[in-house]
Amino acid sequence: VTLNKLSHPRPADLDILLVSPDGTAVMLMSDAGGTAQPANLVSLTFDDSVSVSVPTPLGTGAWKPTDINTGPDTFPVPAPAGPYGATLSAFNGTPAAGTWSLYIFDDDPTGGGTGRLNAGWQLFLTPTL
């Protein structure tokens, strides 16, 4: 999964969730990326084969899904309720055909500022044998 040109003044306020057509959900990023430096047009690729967590400050690159605070994350409807998977391998064996959904939620709207995913997102599927 690649998010293209994400901007937000406090990236650690973001919770990012990917949901497959059958409802399987994986937390890509939560409470990661720091609050001291804004993210400005960073592109993030999430990949289980990468050993590095989302860095602080948030920068362009490939990272493993990272959830810093292991407490429950709550998304507004229509996102599904947790618990959520922690790795993309949670999608193994699930149907790939259908509508995939990406939810990005600012879990601290009092933190100041809003963000934007400026150039959309891409999903790359690798079949398991």
What function would you assign to each model-found segment?
Residues 1-129:
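Loop and turn regions of beta-sandwich accessory domains that flank beta-strands and are enriched
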